[in-house]
Regions:
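Transit-peptide-like, low-complexity N-terminal presequences
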Residues: 1, 166-186
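Alpha-helical transmembrane segments of eukaryotic organelle membrane transporters
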Residues: 2-29, 34-102, 111-166
Length: 186
């Protein structure tokens, strides 16, 4: 059991680093020295903590969802997206924001702001992936399979986090401009 947890943690961490690096290259980073290693470390930290929880939930679904064949696959996909996706996305945004030095209030705002755009991308992506996860892949290899697919997902969710940061900065600039305008009126 401990070996399985360690394998899942290592797999998710390595592949999380690859996904974030891919996103940074997509965003225009051309030299290794330009990579935001702190950003990558934050994403890897989340993925390494998240993987064992997801694996335990999948084992629970296997034990508790009695359906076989296509109905069983669909039930597990819906369970994954219904029970794991909402807290996973929320915790992703909160954890990234807190590790960036934001307050809990700012972190919760980011989670609220980023949840819907991320969920709208998450559902079609992971529902498709998990039809394979729960329909074809042996339970022992599910985390490796999902982690490989997560290369693309990590790039997407990392990009969503960067968009949320940009929206936060724009709101702060607007608030500062409004405050300065009010001060000049006094």
């Amino acid at each position: 059991m401990i070996r399985r947890v360690l394998e899942n943690v290592a797999t998710a961490g390595v592949i999380g680093a690859a996904g974030d690096t891919l996103m940074q290259v997509r965003e225009g980073v051309t030299l290794a020295s330009q990579l935001d290693t702190g950003r990558t470390a934050r994403l890897v930290s989340f993925r390494m903590c998240h993987a064992p929880v997801v694996d335990a939930a999948w084992r629970f679904f296997d034990a508790r969802i009695p359906f076989k064949g296509i109905p069983g696959v669909l039930a597990r996909v819906f369970a994954d997206q219904g029970f794991l996706m909402p807290p996973s996305i929320t915790l992703f945004f909160v954890s990234q924001s807190v590790m960036e030095g934001c307050t809990l209030g700012e972190s919760l705002f980011r989670a609220k702001d980023g949840f819907v755009p991320a969920a709208l991308k998450c559902l079609p992506f992971w529902c498709t992936v998990h039809c394979v996860t729960f329909g074809i892949v042996a339970p022992r290899y599910r985390m490796a399979w999902a982690s490989l697919c997560a290369v693309a997902w990590n790039a997407i969710i990392s990009g969503e986090n960067q968009e949320a940061i940009r929206r936060e900065l724009a709101l702060r600039e607007l608030a500062d401009a409004n405050l300065q305008g009010r001060e000049s009126e006094v």
